[in-house]
């Protein structure tokens, strides 16, 4: 149906609220009881993660098998199976959640589906082996509200992910969806909307941290016959999937926010620039756009007003540099994805030379709820200069890996040791890298740093788009810096000399050091050259690319010195600095290592201790992998 008024919108909300009422109620209550048809439950819902990660692990097969088991038991009128967006706890996927008792099943397989129906849904008995096991207590936890991973989170940008069916516009409307747009069109002037966003303190979540309301104001003040709203969905950081998850789990929030932005700056055209490697996010966005058009929330005369707005999707080829707004705009125009010097800013001259407002996905996801709950509500969350929450992709040597959203001001210690569950295997924390490949590596002394834009910069890192990688004692910080620099060298567009040549020289120096050929003078060159690149590169990619090198030099100088002076790697990660030997006490002469050595570097008689020839050894580690007696020593 075409929505022509706020009354039509309210009618749909009332109709759709029934679908969500069971989920809403279960979200509010805490219960240890397991509900099944045998224990008196009249209606149950099974929520299945439909994000990319879980789909890659056969969540669709789980859905299919659940539906078959429901039909087989003739309970189709009592049980619903609903595909939702990402729950965030990606390492434990595929995830299945039972409503109304909030039972949270992890690492479910298609073969588990029939057991879930027979035992839980019909019998009212939880399946213990599918429950989450707390890494600290080693006890099972059935309800996500009791899990440390979720307890300290505050889901604002992710508010609908894992809760609504992302392909059902009416479920989005039932969660106050499109009411912010309606209120803006019917009750507010464009400048009123901009004022609310400014007062909220929302800053860009794509890495720059520029005040969103101020950016909208600049675009609003430009005089032009055509203006554009661009959603930057080109998420290029390795291991980062914040924006992808929002688009997959709550695409209508992006559509609504782009409409609001269009109204605020005087634009009738929106463009989503998304990498083609995100097929599921693309399909969900297409579905949301088509549904919004069908319901009259995109297109001409939205909600019966004079405001018209529509959205197109443009595909990127996955270049990291195209996350920078001027490079992104060039790519959309069919040109090489190269940044340009600012000013002029896109708000003055952007896509096709017209005023263009560019916001990333997470920034836009905050817009509808800010307008619904008010600027003052949002401004009470976070720190003085960084309001609201931030979504992070938490990964690395940590027990709880996944997507998290925390209030600004939450400390790194809280994220790593409470939400993240501490370091895997009880090993010692060494560093945390924030901000993606252009971020810095922070140490134990930084763990009590409150996370916000300014504090992370002061500590020698950055917020970036939200990558957070935790490292333990087995990680070599010189090798880590080399890994990230290798990525930025590959992703450089090559336009400016500091980035194209300077970063290549930095990488050569790091390769030299990890190969045992470095000198103390090389460390001085790294520091000097890194600072020159920061000061002179054209765009954000080049200006921030030396961060991993400079931060590890500052915080782990002793490791660099060990590499260049002692020719050793304490973490045993730099192959050229390792020496493989065989313990004569442990070796029984089984000859297995010699049989598997690709360089024929191991010799010895059967049942006699073997030896490794250092001049032949290529340090591949095959002998260590094959030895069953821990006789291979590395130093």
Predicted segments, located by residue:
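Ferredoxin-type iron-sulfur electron-transfer modules in oxidoreductases and energy-metabolism complexes
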Residues: 15-44, 59-83, 100-132, 180-197, ...
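Iron-sulfur cluster-binding cysteine motifs and their immediate structural context
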Residues: 92-96, 498-504, 592-609, 622-635
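Short amphipathic, charge-patterned alpha-helical segments
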Residues: 70, 257-259, 409-424
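Hydrophobic alpha-helical positions that pack around
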Residues: 152-153, 282-408, 420
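Flexible inter-domain linker/hinge segments
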Residues: 27, 131-199, 352, 359-374
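Accessory "access/gating" subregions that flank catalytic or transport cores
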Residues: 182-223, 379-380, 385, 393, ...
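Conserved phosphate/anionic-ligand binding catalytic regions in large, soluble enzymes, centered on
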Residues: 50-58, 197-219, 318-330, 336, ...
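C-terminal accessory/binding modules appended to enzymatic or scaffolding proteins
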Residues: 388-400, 406-408, 412, 570-618, ...
